[in-house]
Design a protein with these regions (language model features):
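N-terminal active-site beta-alpha-beta segment that forms phosphate/nucleotide-binding
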Residues: 1-88
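Conserved phosphate- and dinucleotide-binding cores of soluble alpha/beta proteins
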Residues: 51-176
């Protein structure tokens, strides 16, 4: 499932883009595909696993943002990370989500600092896509960081039911 989502995400990219990959296992898969295809673009990330992937030579320019280390998330979040993000304007970002509550129009994650960092990434992005398995629909995390209206689109592994598609379209969400 994660690899299907990652492949769809990579199909949105263009050479020369500046993108943000936040802390997400799907985004690690996105980074692997970009690395394998050697797509010339700039990745900005706060995820350690993505940084480690790019230790080898590549056409990708990698910018790693530090901050407060969150062991549970395997990356950096918080005030310092957020202040660094504010210095960028990303062509596109892929944001991992824990929950997409269609009824209440909320997008959530587990931790406050992670959510605040995701919010800054969205603000700094020309286009922001939620990436997550369809099982994340109508799930909840502990911290709401956005609404559907904050996103350009949603990338998942399968075709969704008509009711879900209608709700997402009402919020102008592109489906991939």
């Amino acid at each position: 499932e994660k690899k299907i989502i990652a492949s769809k995400a990579v199909s949105c990219l263009q050479e020369g883009y500046v993108i943000f990959l936040d802390i997400s296992t799907i985004n690690l898969e996105v980074a692997k595909i970009i690395f394998e295809k050697n797509i010339p673009l700039t990745i900005v990330t706060n995820m350690i696993d993505i940084m480690q992937l790019y230790r080898q030579e590549s056409k990708v320019r990698l910018i790693f943002l530090g901050g407060d280390f969150n062991q549970a998330r395997d990356g950096f979040v918080g005030t310092l990370t957020n202040s660094l993000i504010k210095n960028y304007r990303f062509d596109l970002s892929f944001i991992g989500v824990v929950g997409i509550d269609l009824q209440h129009n909320t997008i959530s994650t587990y931790e406050t600092n992670d959510g605040l960092t995701k919010k800054e990434i969205i603000t700094a992005s020309k286009q922001a896509y939620m990436v997550g398995e369809s099982a994340k629909l109508n799930q909840d995390g502990n911290y709401i960081f956005a609404s559907l209206d904050d996103f350009t689109g949603y990338i998942c592994e399968k075709t969704l039911d008509d009711n879900t598609i209608q709700i997402l379209k009402k919020h102008h969400i592109e489906l991939k």
